[in-house]
């Protein structure tokens, strides 16, 4: 159960990052003032996702050792890289993909799955 909650923290955190990027993209398409930026639905959704992720993270820290939980957050790097490619069509280098592979192997080792 805790591993599933940890995965949810990763998804909320990465979702929040993707929403922040989308907020910036929307501001570039249609310039607006600071007040309008703060009221952006994308920005509000990102704050909600990141806030929920933080609350769930605090809950998990009561149940899991930090030495096990924190390294598992490296999955965030993988998810953000894949999300940036899928949603924002960013170019990802060969070295980045090799790094993703290393991160996945490391997370599996830390989680005792390899």
From Swiss-Prot:
This is Probable 4-amino-4-deoxy-L-arabinose-phosphoundecaprenol flippase subunit ArnE. It is found in: Cell inner membrane. Belongs to the ArnE family. It comes from the Bacteria. The lineage of its organism: Bacteria, Pseudomonadati, Pseudomonadota, Gammaproteobacteria, Aeromonadales. GO terms for molecular function: carbohydrate derivative transmembrane transporter activity. Residues 43-112 form the EamA domain. It is a multi-pass membrane protein. It comes from Aeromonas hydrophila subsp. hydrophila (strain ATCC 7966 / DSM 30187 / BCRC 13018 / CCUG 14551 / JCM 1027 / KCTC 2358 / NCIMB 9240 / NCTC 8049). Pathway: Bacterial outer membrane biogenesis; lipopolysaccharide biosynthesis.
